[in-house]
């Protein structure tokens, strides 16, 4: 009876039978052929969910409720289906309650199986979320729990991940002669892969910098390089660290196609001298009471993608009342609901205005980004590192 009352239909390949978001009440049983089930995601792309062949079925939810379709269903090859809509189901029930009861029972069985699969997916998602949370805590442990506190200086960090884990990172380490290593990096992409690479990057930079700097100090103490100045040691440490890091990544991890932008520096607190390397990173800005003084442009390419490249070392002296602000492109590229970016010009305009502290500057930029993005999902990690030399009265 079902075969005679239901509509039998034949479709060519490429015909859209169910449209995601449409409200329809037709249940399909595949007699011959195959269909593809897919779901629309961001930017007009589709994610393939399943391919159903003869004996498969779809659209059962639409037969019993009035909710939109959850996916698109398109014929993969010429396909023959039975189509059962709400009116057909009602006629079957009226003509033969037994067949109607059996059909309803089968549809309910399908729904029950879907509920079981959904519950299983929920449990798997919860397990994955727990693993991500563990990863977040481990990643958090790679970041310094507190920024260094130095007489006459203020060092502030801010990291706001776009997801559970982040591809951005920062670091600050005080050497035993009071000079300070400062690092800000941005790994390409987002998510777990970027987070793993972030951990590797941070570990390499810290380990190589500490090794090279302490090697210079031992040489000075042993009189092997008596003429070598502290400034030369700072510059050489930066250059050797980035060369070793880039070499290690390109030799051992080139197949990952992962790389990072990297700004890192060593600060000499007594004089305000800063030696730095900028590996393809957004140029940090030096700003003071009279606005922006300069930007610290790239001294070499991205790190981890091109072997055997060279990096120059830049230098600058921070005067009292000046702040050096480094930030990732998540700041300039923060987007609102209409996909309009916050923009570099807006950041520069904020930096022209003086602030009483590095913390106030970072908070003012953060507040401006929040006002711009409002309820839009965060598109990228947002990270800032601010170093301010206090005026004599504030030391």
Which residue stretches match the model-derived regions?
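Short beta-strand His + acidic residue motifs that chelate non-heme Fe in jelly-roll/DSBH
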Residues: 37-38, 60, 71-75, 92, ...
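… and, occasionally, acidic/histidine-rich disordered N-termini of signaling adaptors
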Residues: 22, 120-325, 374-395
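Short acidic-glycine-tyrosine-enriched beta hairpin
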Residues: 43-58, 318
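Regulatory nucleotide-sensing modules
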Residues: 1-45, 164
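Short beta-strand segments in beta-sandwich/barrel cores
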Residues: 7, 16, 34-39, 57, ...
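Ligand-binding loop in jelly-roll beta-barrel domains
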Residues: 64-87, 98
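A cytosolic small-molecule/anion-sensing beta-strand core signal
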Residues: 12-13, 31-32, 53, 77, ...
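A small-molecule sensor/coupling module
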Residues: 1, 69, 87-120, 231
């Amino acid at each position: 009876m079902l075969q005679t009352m239901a509509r039998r239909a034949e479709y060519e390949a490429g015909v859209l039978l169910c449209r995601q978001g449409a409200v329809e009440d037709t249940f399909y049983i595949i007699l011959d052929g195959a269909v593809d089930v897919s779901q629309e995601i961001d930017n007009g792309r589709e994610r393939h969910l399943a391919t159903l062949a003869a004996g498969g079925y779809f659209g059962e939810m639409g037969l019993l409720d009035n909710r939109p379709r959850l996916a698109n269903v398109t014929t993969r090859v010429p396909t023959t289906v039975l189509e059962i809509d709400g009116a057909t189901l009602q006629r079957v029930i009226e003509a033969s309650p037994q067949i109607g009861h059996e059909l309803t029972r089968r549809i309910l069985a399908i729904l029950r199986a879907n509920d079981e699969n959904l519950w299983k997916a929920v449990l798997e998602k919860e397990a994955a979320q727990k693993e991500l949370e563990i990863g977040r805590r481990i990643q958090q442990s790679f970041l310094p729990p507190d920024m260094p506190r130095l007489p006459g200086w203020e060092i502030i960090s801010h990291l706001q991940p776009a997801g559970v884990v982040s591809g951005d990172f920062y670091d600050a380490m005080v050497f035993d002669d009071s000079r300070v290593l400062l690092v800000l990096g941005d790994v390409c992409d987002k998510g777990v892969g970027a987070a793993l690479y972030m951990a590797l990057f941070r570990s390499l930079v810290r380990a190589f910098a500490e090794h090279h700097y302490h090697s210079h100090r031992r040489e000075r103490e042993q009189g092997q390089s008596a003429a070598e100045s502290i400034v030369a040691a700072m510059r050489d440490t930066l250059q050797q660290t980035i060369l070793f890091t880039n070499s290690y990544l390109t030799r051992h991890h080139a197949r990952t196609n992962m790389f990072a932008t990297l700004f890192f520096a060593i600060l000499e607190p007594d004089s305000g001298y800063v030696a730095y390397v900028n590996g393809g990173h957004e140029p940090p800005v030096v700003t003071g009471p009279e606005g922006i003084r300069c930007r610290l442009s790239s001294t070499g390419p991205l790190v981890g993608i091109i072997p055997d490249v060279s990096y120059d070392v830049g230098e600058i002296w921070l005067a009292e009342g000046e702040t050096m602000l480094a930030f990732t492109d998540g700041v300039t590229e923060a987007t609102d609901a209409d996909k309009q970016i916050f923009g570099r010009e807006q950041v520069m305009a904020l930096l022209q205005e003086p602030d009483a502290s590095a913390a106030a500057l970072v908070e003012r930029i953060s507040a401006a980004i929040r006002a711009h993005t409002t309820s839009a999902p965060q598109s990228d990690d947002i990270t800032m590192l601010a170093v301010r030399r206090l005026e004599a009265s504030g030391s």
